């Protein structure tokens, strides 16, 4: 499977459930790259169930509130987050690269130093009498390799090769005409020092900022994540490449009309050592993820526009549900079908809701009315979205974790050494000892 956040969480979850997963990644090295990410309480809860609560708390910051503002910085509506909102688990803002490295270290510690292999290109798969045979190419040597496994789980991102094999007629990712510039920089506190702020007006004009670590000293500078969105018009095909490093001048050009009294966006952009430009992409919801012993997970299954802080969190839940299904259902095909049934409807609904701004509909409605919405109306929009994502306080606090109470009952899954993996874009759960490949 891909060695990103979803794939590594899946490996940890499968290992905890008694399986022998192996991870492969197309990139030659896995590095701490990227910008900020938010993990909602239901995702934090699942990482805590994997024994990662202390490690996560050490690298992340629990935000106190989410505030929506107009383009002049005026307040529209705000709500508490995490523990302050009544959840039993916090919400965390964290640098994606640090989260990635935390998960990678946990996988290597628990599954062994060779559990993650890099530089391997997934080429395709075939079904065998005992499972799946996946085909790969080593990027360094060009040599082909094969791997026999119980199941193949593609978590190789929005341009998933596994997804393309399962849905060969799908075509390119969908672009909505919005460009995003993203970066991180040290900056003085904004508002209470723990706020996520989303400022905007019409769709495609938005500035987001939030801290992703505590400052070294009270009142000092913190590391802030920022995102600028500008709509340049519709397009059938997304830009190529899908993301690139750009000079600060490109982002500054989109900030000419922004005036936020509690934040200087220009300064934040100028302080950023690296600025990345992305087109805002998603894909149409799929009617099916699982095909026999092959399935999809994370962005490979449901890439979505970044509204509502849901993408990474839903991928983590995917991983946990998949491991739970494989542990509870002895037939791998039935297990993947059950996973599909449990997850696909929820995340497909989120993908479609995010195309209509998700909870950020609050900003659009305020712009239409030339002023703040009523608190009741804003609360209604936010709650509707949370309910759809199964992320209200009541839904999260009362739903059992996806932890497997007892590891997989077949001892062969835990004790047999299993062959070395050579996959990318897919997770290989190796067959029990004695299985005929």
Go through the PLM ranges and name each one.
Residues 15, 40-167, 171-184, 235-249, ...:
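Conserved N-terminal helical subregion
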Residues 31-32, 125, 162-163, 304-306:
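Conserved protein kinase catalytic core
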Residues 75-100, 137-147, 186-274:
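Conserved FAD/dinucleotide-binding core of flavoprotein oxidoreductases
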Residues 31-42:
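Accessory recognition modules or surfaces
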Residues 34-36, 91, 238-242, 307-311, ...:
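Short, solvent-exposed loop/turn segments at secondary-structure boundaries
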Residues 73, 287, 308-310, 324-437:
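C-terminal helical "tail/cap" subdomain of flavin- and related membrane-associated enzymes
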Residues 3-28, 153-154, 181, 209, ...:
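Conserved mid-domain beta->alpha element of the FAD-binding
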């Amino acid at each position: 499977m891909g060695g990103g956040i979803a794939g590594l969480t899946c490996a940890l979850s499968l290992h905890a459930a008694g399986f022998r997963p192996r991870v492969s990644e197309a990139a030659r090295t896995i590095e701490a790259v990227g910008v900020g990410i938010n993990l909602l309480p239901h995702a934090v809860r699942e990482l805590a169930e994997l024994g990662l609560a202390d490690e996560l708390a050490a690298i992340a910051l629990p935000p106190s509130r989410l505030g929506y503002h107009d383009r002049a910085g005026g307040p529209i509506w705000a709500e508490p987050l995490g523990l302050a909102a009544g959840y039993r688990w916090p919400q965390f803002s964290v640098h994606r690269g640090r989260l990635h490295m935390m998960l990678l270290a946990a996988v290597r510690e628990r599954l062994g130093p060779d559990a993650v292999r890099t530089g391997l290109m997934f080429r395709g798969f075939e079904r065998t009498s005992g499972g799946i045979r996946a085909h790969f190419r080593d990027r360094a040597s060009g040599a082909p390799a094969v791997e026999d496994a119980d199941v193949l789980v593609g978590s190789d991102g929005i341009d998933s090769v596994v997804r393309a094999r399962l849905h060969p007629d799908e075509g390119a990712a969908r672009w909505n005409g919005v460009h995003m510039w993203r970066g991180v920089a040290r900056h003085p506190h904004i508002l209470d020092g723990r706020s996520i702020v989303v400022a905007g007006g019409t769709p495609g004009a938005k500035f987001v900022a939030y801290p992703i670590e505590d400052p070294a000293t009270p009142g000092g500078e913190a590391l802030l994540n920022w995102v600028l969105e500008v709509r340049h018009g519709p397009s059938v095909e997304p830009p190529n490449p899908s993301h690139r490093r750009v000079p600060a001048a490109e982002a500054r050009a989109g900030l000419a009309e922004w005036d936020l009294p509690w934040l200087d966006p220009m300064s934040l952009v100028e302080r950023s050592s690296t600025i990345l430009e992305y087109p805002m992409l998603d894909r149409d919801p799929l009617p099916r993820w699982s095909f026999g012993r092959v399935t999809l997970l994370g962005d490979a299954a449901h890439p979505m526009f970044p509204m509502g802080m849901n993408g990474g969190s839903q991928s983590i839940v995917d991983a946990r549900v998949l491991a739970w299904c494989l542990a509870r259902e002895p037939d791998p095909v039935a297990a993947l079908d059950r996973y599909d049934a449990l997850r696909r409807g929820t995340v497909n609904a989120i993908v479609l809701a995010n195309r209509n701004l998700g909870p950020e509909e609050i900003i659009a409605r305020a712009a239409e009315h030339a002023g703040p919405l009523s608190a009741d109306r804003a609360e209604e929009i936010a709650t509707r979205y949370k309910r759809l994502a199964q992320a209200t306080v009541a839904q999260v606090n009362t739903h059992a974790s996806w932890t497997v109470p007892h590891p997989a009952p077949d001892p062969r899954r835990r004790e047999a050494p299993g062959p070395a993996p050579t996959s990318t874009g897919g997770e290989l759960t190796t067959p029990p000892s004695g299985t005929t490949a």
